[in-house]
Amino acid sequence: MTVVSVPQREPLVLGGRLAPLGFSSRGYFGALPMVTTAPPPLPRIPDPRALPPTLFLPHFLGGDGPCLTPQPRAPAALPNRSLAVAGGTPRAAPKKRRKKKVRASPAGQLPSRFHQYQQHRPSLEGGRSPATGPSGAQEVPGPAAALAPSPAAAAGTEGASPDLAPLRPAAPGQTPLRKEVLKSKMGKSEKIALPHGQLVHGIHLYEQPKINRQKSKYNLPLTKITSAKRNENNFWQDSVSSDRIQKQEKKPFKNTENIKNSHLKKSAFLTEVSQKENYAGAKFSDPPSPSVLPKPPSHWMGSTVENSNQNRELMAVHLKTLLKVQT
């Protein structure tokens, strides 16, 4: 009779979660004496990828320890070779990724860039393209192959052309003998099998006139509507232009009035200038004329002796009158 207990220093895996370090299996399961006749368990090999047991101690004690995600460890081995997982189930196998189907629109629109990338991305499985069509043929990653066929149109084309058998995918080193090119023609998709030597761009050059004709047919009502709108716009433009012409005809009268006003202003300015010229006051810019200056007394000028006597008498009279000297 042997009683086995898990050591406390090693974390115990319970229900897919890591048990705290202070946890004991005896307190969780109770004192369960287990009688086994099996040989003692082999010593568990330590996992080199496992983290040290003291790493999560501050985190469990409530401190600010490093909150790292614990890596999955092998569960503790029990004597009866059973896992210590309470209600644990084996991990389910990963589900295979299902390829999303492209919704076919009535107008034959292009799929999203993600689907185009998924379709034309080279896979690692022996050079086989992951985006093989419903017939299993290898699609050409070109501009013409970007259009996804609608299921109804694809079924119709497959039923109409039984000659196009599903081609085997070519080896990675070899080039396929035929390439299937998807073409969209006004919302309808067709598959055309071409030999390897023929270029893909030749189809577009050959089919361009037909597409242009169809576009012109569909664009006829649009051109009519646009022409009617243009006629309306021309009518409004004509009316606006006539209004502008009338305004421009009215403008010359205003121009003549402006010219008259400018002439009047110029004449008033000229009269003011002429009046200033007639003013006899002193002008600091021009030298004074001799007629405006006062005449000096005659005795200052060089004169004869006779005039000098008369001037003396006059000066004596002037001085007496100025000084009020009584004679």
UniProtKB/Swiss-Prot annotation:
Subcellular location: Nucleus
Organism whose genome encodes this protein: Homo sapiens
Variant or mutagenesis effect after changing residue 287 to A: Abolishes the interaction with the nuclear receptors
The protein, known as: Proline-rich nuclear receptor coactivator 1
Pfam family name, one: PNRC
Regions of compositional bias (Basic residues) in chain numbering: 93-103
Pro residues: bias regions: 287-297
Swiss-Prot/TrEMBL domain comment: The interaction between PNRC1 and nuclear receptors is dependent on the SH3 binding motif.
Ranges in a coiled coil: none
Motif, Nuclear localization signal: chain positions: 94-101
Gene that specifies this protein: PNRC1
Stretches the record annotates as Disordered: 66-175, 280-300
A Gene Ontology biological process term: nuclear-transcribed mRNA catabolic process, nonsense-mediated decay
Family classification: Belongs to the PNRC family. PNRC1 subfamily.
Sorted UniProt keywords: Activator, Nucleus, Transcription, Transcription regulation
Sequence motif SH3-binding, residues: 285-291
Subunit structure: Interacts with many nuclear receptors including AR, ESR1, ESRRA, ESRRG, NR3C1/GR, NR5A1, PGR, TR, RAR and RXR. Interacts with GRB2.
Gene Ontology CC: nucleus; P-body
Keyword Methyltransferase in record: no
Tissues expressing the protein: Expressed in liver, lung, fat and NK/T cells.
Function: Nuclear receptor coactivator. May play a role in signal transduction.
UniProt biased composition (Low complexity): 141-162
